[in-house]
Structure formats: structure tokens, C-alpha cells
Amino acid sequence: MKKIIDVNAHLHTPYSFSAFTDVRQALDMAAAEDVRIVGINDFYSMDGYREWNDECATRHLYPMFNIEFISLNSEDQAAGLRVNDPNNPGRTYLSGKGLAYPVILSGKEAQMLADVRAESNAQVERMCAKLNAHLDAVKAGFSIDFKQVVKDLTRGSVRERHLAKALRM
């Protein structure tokens, strides 16, 4: 009888936000659990693909290359329609699976992806400003330095979870 191969096609890495300290830790854990096919799946980023590919090769794992986007439909939000996020009406997570590596994105498409990531980062920067206004209002005695968060806690894509992590530090 053929053995079924264990697959995890949806692993977030520090290239967007991750519970793992680095790509190596994620892949070491997958290998230890005999997961043989592993997919990187970061928000708005393909930046980790090379490292993912190389680290998979050293562990004899089969790499998948994926990407994830979050969309918001304001009409669905107003109507309370939940798509695939049970807590946020109108929000939809879209995940592209089995993308090419090396990345063959150029020109208009590469610029569109860069623009989406820049807007996502700008949105989180606006969240940081609101968080700092709240911290000031409650006289917390500290604030979150957005540029420092980007520098110390990210690999270019900043998420609201990075702000939460900075707040706990």
C-alpha cells in the first residue's frame, strides 16, 4: 500500500508574519513531523522564495510557492456577509498556490504587487498612529516607533501583529 505524503501548503514565514523565528525553524519542525511537501504562504510577498527553496533542498523537502492577499468588499461588509473570515464581514483571504520559482514577475505585475504591499504597510502605519494616540490618551508613558518596528521585527512587510508584538515588548 502506498504511503500518503503529509503536506502543509500554508506556512507563513517572517517575510510577512509568523510564529516561527525563521524559515529554518519552520522547516525543521515540518521535517521532524515527517511533512514532506511544504508551502511558503506569505501576505503580499514572494521575498522568501529563494530561502524557502534552498532550505527545503537541504532537508529533502518538496517546496511549494504561494502568496496570500486580503481583500475587503465594503458592500459585503455593510451587509454582514462573511466569506472566509468568520470575525470580519466582507473580508476575504485569497491564496495563490503553486506559483513559479524562480519568480517570473516583472513590469506591470511586479509594480502592482509592490503597490499592494506598500499600501498594506501604509495602512499598518496608520494603525500605529492610532495606537500611539490611544497610548498618549491613557498616559501609558511610551509609544511605538513604526520605523523601528519595521527595522527590528519585519523583513519588509509589516502587519498589525507586528504592532501587537512591539506593544508586548
Stretches found by the model and what they are:
Residues 155-169:
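Extended, H/D-rich, highly charged conserved domains that either
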